[in-house]
Amino acid sequence: MVTGSDLKESQHAVDIAREHSGLCYATVGVHPCSAKQFDTYPGGASALLSALRDLVQTSKAAGHAVAFGEIGLDYDRLFLTPKETQLKYFEAQLELAVEVQLPLFLHSRAASEDFERLLAAKLPLLPKKGLVHSFTGTVEEMRRMVDMQLDVGVNGCSLKTEDNVEVVRQIPVERLQIETDGPWCEMRPSHASAKYLKDAPPLPKAVKKEKWAQGLMVKGRNEPAAIPHVAWAIAKIKDIPVEDVCEA
């Protein structure tokens, strides 16, 4: 899954999905930290929404765009986009997602009350609800997401602390999705998840970017190739076979 965080990145994600059809798929949307682009876009917010609509309709019809996002709220980084701007354009994009009938690829940081309030008004209009990715919330917040029939995405950032681990332990397997969020959210030796990786199969060797070759990873960058370790840690945390995590 190649994620769009604004119009330009969404177009690039669709281009990658087209070039690697059947292997890569795209999301289309504007990330909350980029939502101020609606007010600076030539022609204003309505023009940007129209451009998003055109892109998502054509790419969905071609089988390349499979979700609307990454959209949501991020109150940890209000210095990037003010709260009221985030709220306004999260709601506008939810309306567009309902119009084009794509499941949601969602982002939420320190904004659970507003996030859930806006979602509750639109989710009944989406048969395929979506995913709250890179989940780092509380057990209570996770349960509310599950009650809303949303899936919960887990990556390295979801496994940093013992509290995070306990949340993951309680996510119903049928509502769990594994992800890397590369190039970010790598699993680190300092994280609470590290002890669950002691007997994990090794990942491909990581080298400096200028020494990269096919089959290797780039040092200091999280990559999709690291997803087996996410699945392995979750399996150990839940005390279930790793195959059950992957098949869920």
What annotation goes with each model-predicted range?
Residues 1-248:
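Mid-domain alpha/beta scaffold segments of enzyme catalytic cores
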